Amino acid sequence: MASSSPCQIFLVFVMVTLVTSLIPSNALLTPHFYDNVCPQALPTIKSVVLHAILREKRIGASLLRLHFHDCFVNGCDGSVLLDDTPNFTGEKTALPNINSIRGFSVVDEIKAAVDKVCKGPVVSCADILATAARDSVAILGGPQFFYNVLLGRRDARTASKAAANANLPSPTFNFSQLISNFKSQGLNVKDLVALSGGHTIGFARCTTFRNRIYNETNIDPIFAASLRKTCPRNGGDNNLTPLDFTPTRVENTYYRDLLYKRGVLHSDQQLFKGQGSESDKLVQLYSKNTFAFASDFKTSLIKMGNIKPLTGRQGEIRLNCRRVR
C-alpha cells in the first residue's frame, strides 16, 4: 500500500485541528455538544448499536454495563476501554471487570463509523459509551426509556486497576455496603435502586450467585432449585443465567422478582427485605409502575453520567478507544 505524502499528513493534521477548535471548551455537558461540529454523530452511534443488538441482543446489556463500570472508576472518562500494554495497566483485568465486561469490538465499530462521518476524531470514547448505553436502553425498552444524553466528555490518558477493584460494587455487597459505595459517587438510595434496574437485562455468571442459591435463606426455594440446574456446587463458574425472566427487554420484571425473593444476586435482593425501608418502597413502586421506573432510571443514568467527566481541554479525544495517543 502506498505511503502518505508529507502534504497529505499535514492536511489531515490541519483538518483535525480545525475540527477540534470548533468544539466548545466550557466545562458543562450538553446534549447539543456535537450539533454543529458533527450532526451525524448520534444517528451513526444509534445505527451501529441497533445492528449490534440485532446480531446479539445480549450486547445491549454489555454496553450499559461498560458505561456503569467506566463511570464508577474515577469518572466517566473512557478509561475502562484501555488495553493493557507492556508499559501500561488498564482496568480490564480488575476483579470486577475480568470475565464480566464485554462489547469492546462494538465500541471499536462505533468509533470507526463516527470518525468516518465526522471526518476525524471528534467524538470521545467516553461519550460513545454514554450514548451507546442510552441507545441500548431505548432500543430494548422502547420510547419511554429514551433520554437526551449530556455530552462533551473527553477521554482519560490514564486508568487505575486499583480504583476499579476498590470502587466497583460487588454482587456480594450487603445493603449498607451498597449505600456507602453509591454515596461515594454522589448517588443516593433512589439512584441505587433505580440504577440496579439495569439488571432487567443481561446475565450473571454462576460464580457470582453460587453462594446465594446454596447457602442463603432469603430466596424462593423453587427459584433457587431452578438456578442450581445451571450452577452446580463445583465447576461451571462461567455458566450464565438471566438476571430476570426477560433478559433482553428493559421493563420492571426485575423488581417484581425481588418482591418474591427471586433476585439472582445477593446484592439485588438486598434492595428488598420487606421491612418498609425507603428501598423497599421504591422496589414496590417500580414493580407496579413501569413509568415511574423509566423516569427515575433515566434521571439516575444522567446523574451517573455526570460523575467527574473530563471536559474542555482536559484529557484527549482518542484515535483508538483502546489506547491513548
UniProtKB/Swiss-Prot annotation:
Keyword Hydrolase appears in the UniProt entry: no
Annotated residues for binding of Ca(2+) 1: 70, 73, 75, 77, 79
Induction context: Induced rapidly and transiently by the Sinorhizobium meliloti synthesized lipochitooligosaccharide signal molecule (Nod factor RmlV) in early steps of nodulation, during the preinfection period, prior to the colonization by S.meliloti and nodule morphogenesis. Triggered by reactive oxygen species (ROS) such as hydrogen peroxide H(2)O(2), possibly in response to S.meliloti in the nodulation zone of roots.
Binding note for cofactor: Binds 1 heme b (iron(II)-protoporphyrin IX) group per subunit.
Sugar-modified residues: 87, 174, 215
Site positions per UniProt: Transition state stabilizer: 65
Positions that bind Ca(2+) 2: 200, 244, 246, 251
Cofactor entry: heme b; Ca(2+)
A single BP term in Gene Ontology: response to oxidative stress
GO cellular component terms, semicolon-separated: extracellular region
Annotated binding of heme b, by residue: 199
Residue positions binding substrate: 169
Domain of life from the UniProt record: Eukaryota
Disulfide cross-links: 38-118, 71-76, 125-321, 206-231
Subcellular location: Secreted
Name of the protein in question: Peroxidase RIP1
Gene behind this protein: RIP1
